[in-house]
Amino acid sequence: MSVAEIKKSDVVAQFARGANDTGSPEVQVALLTTRINELTVHFKAHTKDHHSRRGLLRMVSRRRKLLDYLKGKDADRYRALIEKLGLRK
């Protein structure tokens, strides 16, 4: 297993709602958040990497849409996820 696969499986295990859950909004948002955080560190060193920045903005938009969906479906799960991930300070 690569390092990325190990990190991914750890995140899925932490945020999964069930044993084989990989597609719930909580898991998807958590995976996107870890990738966004890794890219944020990358951009501190590579400020002119505009091609990757476009991908970052796309991930942020996707996370925002998933959070909006979750907020509309179940506000309690939304609040718990935001608190667990440390978003919205």
From Swiss-Prot:
Organism per entry: Paraburkholderia phymatum (strain DSM 17167 / CIP 108236 / LMG 21445 / STM815)
Fetch the InterPro entries from UniProt.
Ribosomal_uS15, Ribosomal_uS15_bac-type, uS15_NS1_RNA-bd_sf
Provide the assembly information. Part of the 30S ribosomal subunit. Forms a bridge to the 50S subunit in the 70S ribosome, contacting the 23S rRNA.
Q: What protein family is recorded?
A: Belongs to the universal ribosomal protein uS15 family.
Keyword vocabulary terms for this entry? Ribonucleoprotein, Ribosomal protein, RNA-binding, rRNA-binding
Give the SMART domains listed for this entry.
Ribosomal_S15
Q: What is this protein called?
A: Small ribosomal subunit protein uS15
What is one Pfam family matched by this protein?
Ribosomal_S15
Q: Which GO terms describe its molecular function?
A: rRNA binding; structural constituent of ribosome
Biological processes per GO annotation: translation
- How is this protein annotated for GO cellular component? cytosolic small ribosomal subunit
The job of this chain, per UniProt, is described as: One of the primary rRNA binding proteins, it binds directly to 16S rRNA where it helps nucleate assembly of the platform of the 30S subunit by binding and bridging several RNA helices of the 16S rRNA. Forms an intersubunit bridge (bridge B4) with the 23S rRNA of the 50S subunit in the ribosome.
